[in-house]
């Protein structure tokens, strides 16, 4: 069962020269092109989304809450609803962008109309740093933590760890940076080649990089691992990587 979306507008947000490139925000302009943007910018994204549902089903406990923190348009929420079969589970999707939550709700209504026996879902427009988490068997954060201020990441992960039920898991996907300068340069260049192959111009690539450089701050895998262990998780395993994009599972 595929993800349900509208036909996305083509991402042309950075196609024209901008005298001053503003910081990237998840506003209505981004929402209109987001499915196209993410597909053309993040290698392996469909595989990650689909398998968060598959892997999440292994950790979901009956009659528990499953969180999609930073849910954007609800791709992970839809995947969890398709794959999790545990009795009494429900998904809570959280995002601080009103435009994202509004469009996400439309996509979920469309999914409900197309498929039967999906998990119930609730959408919350909120800052995940201020959210009081219910006891949960699964938390997914798909390219969300990298937009949280670095000095607030550990506190957020501690809150998630406290809310996790025994046998639960956190699935965390992030863009990575690399401590080795040559490895970082190689994978950065290969990612740029991926974007070129998907139709982005040099101008679009450069301007989007400028828009993101102050708001998206990636960590190395080792930094993620050390922070997750400091937050109280017992084990961290990377299950996917494509170029400089990866996903990991952290167990309580």
UniProtKB/Swiss-Prot annotation:
Disulfide bonds: none
EC number per UniProt: 2.1.3.-
Top-level taxon of origin: Bacteria
InterPro entries: CmoA, Methyltransf_25, SAM-dependent_MTases_sf
One GO BP annotation of this record: tRNA wobble uridine modification
UniProt: S-adenosyl-L-methionine binding residues: 45, 70-72, 95-96, 127-128, 142, 209
Keywords in alphabetical order: S-adenosyl-L-methionine, Transferase
Chemical reaction(s) catalysed: prephenate + S-adenosyl-L-methionine = carboxy-S-adenosyl-L-methionine + 3-phenylpyruvate + H2O
Annotated GO MF terms: carboxyl- or carbamoyltransferase activity; S-adenosyl-L-methionine binding
Key word Oxidoreductase present: no
Pfam families given in the database record: Methyltransf_25
Subunit: Homodimer.
Protein purpose: Catalyzes the conversion of S-adenosyl-L-methionine (SAM) to carboxy-S-adenosyl-L-methionine (Cx-SAM).
Similarity section: Belongs to the class I-like SAM-binding methyltransferase superfamily. Cx-SAM synthase family.
Protein name: Carboxy-S-adenosyl-L-methionine synthase
Organism of origin: Pseudomonas paraeruginosa (strain DSM 24068 / PA7)
């Amino acid at each position: 069962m595929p993800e349900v979306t509208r036909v996305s507008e083509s991402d042309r947000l950075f196609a024209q020269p901008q005298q001053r490139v503003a910081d990237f925000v998840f506003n209505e302009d981004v929402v209109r092109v987001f499915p196209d943007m993410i597909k053309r910018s993040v290698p392996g994204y469909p595989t990650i989304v689909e398998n968060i549902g598959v892997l999440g089903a292994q950790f979901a406990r009956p009659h528990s809450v499953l969180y999609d923190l930073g849910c954007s348009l609800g791709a992970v929420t839809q995947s969890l609803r398709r794959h999790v079969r545990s009795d009494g589970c429900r998904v809570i999707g959280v995002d601080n962008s009103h435009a994202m939550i509004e469009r996400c709700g439309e996509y979920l209504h469309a999914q409900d109309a197309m498929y039967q026996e999906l998990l119930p879902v609730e959408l919350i427009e909120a800052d995940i740093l201020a959210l009081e988490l219910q006891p949960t068997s699964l938390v997914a954060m798909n390219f969300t933590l990298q937009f949280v201020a670095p000095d607030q990441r550990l506190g957020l992960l501690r809150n998630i760890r406290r809310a996790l039920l025994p046998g639960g898991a956190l699935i965390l996907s992030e863009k990575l940076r690399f401590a080795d300068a040559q490895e970082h340069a190689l994978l950065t260049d290969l990612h740029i080649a991926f974007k070129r192959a998907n139709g982005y111009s040099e101008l679009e690539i450069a301007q989007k990089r400028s828009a993101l450089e102050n708001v998206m701050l990636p960590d190395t895998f080792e930094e993620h691992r050390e922070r997750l262990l400091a937050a109280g998780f017992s084990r961290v395993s990377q299950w996917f990587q494509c170029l400089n994009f990866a996903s990991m599972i952290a167990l309580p």
